[in-house]
Amino acid sequence: MIKQAIEKVVNHENLTFEESEAVLDEIMNGEAYEVQTASLLTALTAKNPTIDEIAGAAASMRSHALAFPETKDVLEIVGTGGDHANTFNISTTSAIVVAATGTQVAKHGNRAASSKSGAADVLEALGLDINETPAVSYESLQENNLAFLFAQEYHKSMKYVAPVRKQLGFRTIFNILGPLANPAHPTHQLLGVYDETLLEPLANVLKKLGVTNAMVVHGRDGLDEMTTADETAVVELQDDHLTKYTVTPEQFGLKRRQRADLVGGTPEANANITRRILAGDHGPQRDIVLLNAGAALHVAHPDLSIQAGIDLAAKTIDDGKAFEELNRLLAFSDKRKDVVA
């Protein structure tokens, strides 16, 4: 299959959803030579992958992932990474705030690739066990409204792709597949992307993968987040319909900040930023978390406007519930460590 797929893509022909899924199955099963995988990834990058090619590849990644118990109405807050902005962990902090409102969040993430601190790094620095089994993570989702799914634990088949990606050294389709391959199969998703041209294609991919409500966002300062340093371009998926619009921090009563105000550091430094935000500190870092948490709450509860989501996120922090959520997660993690020990 992979030989035919390479030939098609080299000739600038598009693969169908089924063909893309099948060829990724071949790669994920270790049946393709590295040179074939490299050829396919290079050709896809040169051609630009289509919605069907991305969705088919994501479906294959999902099917090869470690199984996660079935969920209903679960939210994911995630970015593609690759913006090289070295911000603190905005999505992860926002996920904790959203979980504290009673909204279930299945956070799928990894260690840092293009930054100093990925979701796994900062959660580990906060004191959480990032290597929990699917059963334990599901239990956390039910008890604490938040589960972390460590990508490298769930996607063992990526071992067939990792060396090729490293040797190629440029962005490939896999740079956008991670956020689309959450084993919890979220129905609602706030997805940040590193390039504005990805907004509409990835919104359509999410739709194809069964996501019912989503916002795909790109900060025009380059962030793969909703940003307070510039406008944010948005494509929203709701009721099978896509809407494009732009938002500014000012329209939500937030100050426009400098991107330098949002820069983080090591996992330990970022963990301290997260703790301070959850504890109620005000400033630029809180504001961008409020914006992203507010957008995520709108995605999870479409009747709630982004502004109402921001207000709820602020109240959740100011009432101490967000910090309580972190403490619950830590207590749960410690309890499970004791059980294992």
Swiss-Prot record:
**Which is one Pfam family of this protein?**
Glycos_transf_3
The residues that hold Mg(2+) 1 are: S91, E225
Q: Does the keyword Transferase apply?
A: yes
Which InterPro entries does the record cross-reference, listed alphabetically? Anthranilate_Pribosyl_Tfrase, Glycosyl_Trfase_fam3, Glycosyl_Trfase_fam3_N_dom, Glycosyl_Trfase_fam3_N_dom_sf, Nuc_phospho_transferase
Q: Does the keyword Electron transport apply?
A: no
Sites binding anthranilate 2 sit at R165
Please give the name of this protein. Answer: Anthranilate phosphoribosyltransferase
Gene Ontology MF term list: anthranilate phosphoribosyltransferase activity; magnesium ion binding
Fetch the HAMAP family from UniProt.
TrpD (MF_00211)
- Which reactions fall under this protein's catalytic activity? N-(5-phospho-beta-D-ribosyl)anthranilate + diphosphate = 5-phospho-alpha-D-ribose 1-diphosphate + anthranilate
Q: Name the Gene Ontology biological process terms.
A: L-tryptophan biosynthetic process
Q: How does it assemble?
A: Homodimer.
Q: Which organism is it from?
A: Lacticaseibacillus casei (strain BL23) (Lactobacillus casei)
Q: Which residues hold Mg(2+) 2?
A: D224, E225
The entry marks the following residues as binding 5-phospho-alpha-D-ribose 1-diphosphate, namely 79, 82-83, 87, 89-92, 107-115, 119
Cofactors named for this entry: Mg(2+)
Q: Name one GO cellular component term.
A: cytosol
**Which pathway does the protein contribute to?**
Amino-acid biosynthesis; L-tryptophan biosynthesis; L-tryptophan from chorismate: step 2/5
Going by the UniProt record, its keywords in alphabetical order are: Amino-acid biosynthesis, Aromatic amino acid biosynthesis, Glycosyltransferase, Magnesium, Metal-binding, Transferase, Tryptophan biosynthesis
Write down the EC number. Answer: 2.4.2.18
Q: What does this protein do?
A: Catalyzes the transfer of the phosphoribosyl group of 5-phosphorylribose-1-pyrophosphate (PRPP) to anthranilate to yield N-(5'-phosphoribosyl)-anthranilate (PRA).
> What does the similarity note say?
Belongs to the anthranilate phosphoribosyltransferase family.
